[in-house]
Regions:
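Extended polybasic, low-complexity segments that bind anionic RNA or targeting/receptor surfaces
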Residues: 1-127
Length: 127
């Protein structure tokens, strides 16, 4: 995760597993507070940088390059989808829709992933 560029240096255990209450967060402000509490403030700063692409991609509708941020894996979306969509580079994925494209975007493994407890349990049952 750190080799991929994520700023999660003070976290000891990865992936991050949180309570199911995180699925009920509906406001981006509350989600940003959650990031700061678990020590991902530098990660938020990293993904907020947007650069202008070099070359002709600007003319073809791909003007900005954005960084890939954390992925939230949940069992059901009770409002967290609306909170996460306002943070550039972050995604929410239900367990049944989880694929390699979410976990390793651009074929680069090691995305910072935040699982809920019920999502981990459901992953174990699916196998």
């Amino acid at each position: 995760v750190l080799k991929r560029g994520h700023k999660a240096g003070n976290l000891k255990i990865l992936p991050i597993i949180v309570e199911d209450r995180i699925q009920e967060i509906k406001r981006t402000k509350d989600l940003v507070e959650f990031f700061v509490k678990i020590g991902l403030a530098k990660e938020l700063e990293r993904i907020s940088e947007v650069k202008i692409r070099a070359g002709k991609g600007k003319m073809r509708g791909r003007k900005y390059k954005t960084k890939i941020g954390p992925l939230f894996v949940v069992t059901e979306d009770k409002g967290i989808g609306k909170a996460v969509r306002n943070i550039i580079g972050s995604d929410v994925c239900k367990v049944q829709n989880l694929s390699a494209e979410y976990l390793a975007p651009g074929a680069a493994a090691g995305r910072l992933t935040i699982f809920t407890k019920s999502a981990i349990e459901k992953l174990g049952v699916q196998k």
